[in-house]
Amino acid sequence: MNFSKIEALKAELQSRRPLNPSELKRLREEFMIEHTYHSNAIEGNTLTLRETALILQEGVTIAEKPIKDHLDVIGYKDAFEYIISLIAPECPLTESIIRQIHSLVLMDDAANRGIYRSVPVRILGALHEPPQPYLIAPQMEALLRDYTVQKQQMHI
């Protein structure tokens, strides 16, 4: 593989480091808001980007919007902050960590938090077909094995 473009972009990024703390905080917050909004919108959440930002930044409740939509936003924020907390100590990615993230994201769904689904699902309008429930655990194991190998071989 030719990594010259990646190397050039990496060098440009390195030349801008370190980011000042206020800029880093602003970028992280902006990313969290947009990621939370888009991730939840895909799942049918009715909040707008602005409403999502208000919930995350001001802690407000949006009138006439379902409480589930608010909990989805808060759950994504908690999961995002948890993931950020794992970066500095360089915690290895494990099934336990993935389940914990899942548990945070599904804060309003106690019955399904942190566990693999037990029923088949379909995504309307999508070509992708999610795996059958009995395949999820072995596919997660394979994913984590592949991740470990790829991480050791990555060009960083």
Predicted segments, located by residue:
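FIC/Doc superfamily catalytic core
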Residues: 1-156
